[in-house]
């Protein structure tokens, strides 16, 4: 016993021992043992056994309640509970102590971890992955769902001319040899292990059977064949997130990526593991908590014959929810095709219900590329593209131009500042209020008569609406625009930039 533990009661020592567990203070735990009575277990073996189990099941928030102490037998009966990756585990147990001239020491064996655990048993954790929910359009067509890709991997023991083979694989997969070597040098890798290197598009046989197969499909087929010619390379099917509309809905749907160390830290306790994916943008990010679901998990004891001996904890899998949008796939694609070469955003709404039927930002990127894994060169090219394909234009403010004229008309009519039947007179195609405007003139494209509100809207007359704005006045215009919701956050699932009618504090 250590000096600090000398003559502490067995009850106190047991509580202290248990509270070392979530702190991973295994050396301190070992120092409290009567080593000879504990089977002369070495400190190294003790730490290896305890850390593997407690950290494997992710123990935290431990609680201990002393039930009784048998002074004659020197046994402490206690109740303990702690949180794990599969929920709370709680059990009653007994701990034996021996006493010498230095104080009480704990007699340890595997049953102190779990009552029915022996040295020949193993504690296993089994995880059932939750299926991510689908993102659907208004008609149930998939915008984001399950797809299949090809996982290219290496069996290290089957590689011939390792350096040359890795160079070939790197070139075909458009990654560096160093990236491959890093994956092959992972601690878990053995000669007969399948080590996933990169996910690439799967070649569907039906696509190759068409009269004139797509050139990209043929190139992908050729790449598959060249990879499989290299000894040690294997290609297997793997389930991935797939975005059928690609560029047409990339900014709307967004994409998922594998979790990072930062994600695991930020979302600790929310069910993410090193193998999880997480929504990074668009609907995938916005509805992450609904889409991701909750993995199922079991902790159980397995005996020396590999059979389950006892279930310790279990959380049932909860698959992610499907999210249905008001978007119409056909309209979304149609708008994208019309404007894909332009820097633009397009919004289609049902004027009676307010439902958004399409949200398009162009130019765009293919969100499927993020699933396959972008190289640093591809990522740099995307971000440095002068057309900014990653920039989501439908979330930003745009100068409305002539679409603001109906708003000016509405403000004028509501305030009584303008009479819709008043003829402002034909002043030609250029006009200014007076000499105080200097060289500035308001221009328009069409001369017409009578110059009344209805015709001004038909001909989009800049001069008419300049005069109307002057009649309305600064104070009334600002007040009315504020009442219409300008300078406020739009009540919409996707966070939008706040609308504004001036680049300064008001209308000048």
Feature annotation, model-predicted:
Residues 1-19, 23:
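Short, low-complexity N-terminal intrinsically disordered segments enriched in polar/charged residues
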Residues 49-345, 365-389, 397:
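Extracytoplasmic/periplasmic proteins that interact with beta-lactams or build/remodel peptidoglycan
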Residues 24, 35-39, 142-145, 160, ...:
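Bacterial peptidoglycan biogenesis and beta-lactam-recognition machinery
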Residues 4-8, 326, 385, 455:
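Short helix-capping and inter-helix turn/linker motifs at the boundaries of alpha-helical repeat units
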Residues 5-13, 147, 164, 390, ...:
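Alpha-helix N-cap/N′ positions at the starts of helices
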Residues 12-16, 26-74:
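Short solvent-exposed beta->alpha transition segments
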Residues 302-313, 351-402, 407-508:
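Beta-lactam-recognizing serine transpeptidase/beta-lactamase-like catalytic domain environment
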Residues 1-5, 136, 424:
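Juxtamembrane and targeting peptides
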